[in-house]
Design a protein with these regions (language model features):
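Nucleic-acid-processing active sites and adjacent nucleic-acid-binding tracks
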Residues: 32-68
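Glycine-rich, often acidic, oxyanion-interacting loops/wings at catalytic, nucleic-acid
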Residues: 152-248
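Short glycine-rich phosphate-binding loop at a beta-alpha junction
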Residues: 66-76
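Gly/Thr-rich phosphate-binding beta-strand-loop-beta motif of the actin/hexokinase/Hsp70
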Residues: 7-32, 120
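Low-complexity, acidic/Ser/Thr- and charged residue-rich accessory regions of DNA metabolism proteins
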Residues: 294, 333-378
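Phosphate-backbone recognition surface of nucleic-acid-processing proteins
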Residues: 245-251, 257-345
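Short alpha-helix plus adjacent loop in nuclease-associated cores
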Residues: 94-137, 192-193, 295-304
């Protein structure tokens, strides 16, 4: 009987890979030297514990103390502070688009943090090995670029909140037969209005609720106006590239303050596009054909990009038809979809939105005014 001794891996590996599966309470860490894996769990946001596990993994997986380290995690609620902290530690980190991660097509699949972190490790190793299609890496904005988006996003939330207060007041009054035409009428209604037909006094608790609802509406409305004033003040007073782009976009007839602000802060300010295909794809406005066997059809746009930009561009496309009727884009739309029904025009407006977004990108990056477009004041 022969005794076979198991060989030991005594080589010093030059690279240590780390994948992170993040949750609110725990972080699952996966380490690999390309041959052997190590899985550990730490408390969420416990940075000293993370650094200690990294040093221990280097020892356990036979990696040099100063070996090159590559890591990744999925983009999510934790934002980019982890990425910035890893970079500060000298670790090359990649933040992954969750939608690009491969998943099993089985009807039922195992779903645990351990399975997920091992899958991320395999994808990271494939990506670093040259298989760039294994996953999609997202571009990270700077802290300042991230902060630039706060004003328009806060305004977006406040507008929804203001609409909810308005709808609530109208709903409360209509249950007593009173139709509210203007919100400025609420104080007068509370003072002397009576229910329709029967004419009884409005109940006291209803009046109290309406008073509080109106106060909340006025507060939100004042905050919206303050944000809009601040946006205009910054755009007119600050001589920085982002504000210059806003002013440049506003020069086109049909493009207003909010459209130019959102397009700049959410899209054009910090993203780098190499060609028009990347512009359309980032907004999720590119087509997704289905062509398999004898079946060929269009599945609509991908909707894989920035939802705010996609919604804005559809609205802006309708405004473009109204304010720039003699532009080449508007004339193209009328030739292709002008004689069609409502459904065809809705399809066409998405195509126009994609073309318009590309035209605005060329206008900002290369100074090319969209063909036939009119500038304000001309």
């Amino acid at each position: 009987m022969k005794t076979v001794l198991q060989s030991k891996d005594t080589a010093i590996h030059p690279v240590l890979y780390m994948a992170m599966e993040l949750s609110h309470k725990k972080w699952k860490l996966g380490f690999s030297n390309g041959k052997k894996n190590r899985i550990r769990t730490i408390d969420a946001r416990d940075w000293p514990a993370l650094l200690a596990e990294i040093e221990l993994a280097k020892s356990k997986l036979s990696c040099a103390i100063d070996c090159k380290m590559l890591s990744c995690y999925e983009a999510g609620r934790d934002g980019f502070w982890i990425h910035r902290a890893l970079i500060a530690e000298g670790i090359e980190n990649q933040v992954l688009d969750s939608a690009s991660i491969e998943v099993s097509r089985r009807k039922k699949q195992v779903k645990t943090d351990r399975v997920d972190v091992l899958a991320l490790l395999r994808l990271l190793i494939r990506y670093i090995g040259g298989e760039k299609q294994a996953l999609r890496v997202i571009r990270i904005p700077t802290v300042a670029e991230e902060d630039d988006r706060r004003l328009n996003r806060e305004r977006e939330r406040l507008l929804k909140e203001r609409g909810a207060h308005r709808a609530r007041m109208k709903s409360l009054l209509v249950t007593h037969g009173i139709v509210l035409e203007k919100l400025a009428e609420v104080p007068r209604i509370l003072a002397k209005a009576k229910a329709a037909v029967i004419g009884y006094e409005l109940p006291p608790d209803l009046k109290s609720e309406l008073e509080r609802e109106y106060q909340r509406y006025e507060l939100v409305n004042s905050q919206v106006r303050e944000l809009e004033r601040l946006q205009i003040e910054r755009a007119e007073s600050q001589d920085i590239p982002a504000m210059q782009k806003i002013q440049h976009l506003r020069g086109l007839k049909g493009v207003g303050w909010q459209s130019s602000w959102i397009l700049t802060m959410e899209f054009f300010n910090w993203r780098e596009f190499k060609n028009s295909k990347q512009v359309g794809a980032c907004a999720g406005l590119t087509p997704t054909p289905y062509d398999s066997g004898d079946k060929t059809r269009e599945q609509g746009i991908s909707k894989a990009g920035n939802k705010r930009i996609r919604q804005l561009m559809v609205e802006l496309a309708w405004l473009w038809l109204r304010y720039q009727p003699d532009s080449d884009l508007s004339l193209w739309f009328e030739r292709r979809f002008g004689s069609g029904g409502k459904r065809m025009r809705r399809i066409g407006i998405v195509a126009l939105a994609r073309k318009l977004l590309v035209a605005l990108w060329r206008y900002l990056e290369h100074g090319v005014i969209p063909q036939g477009a009119v500038l304000k004041g001309v």
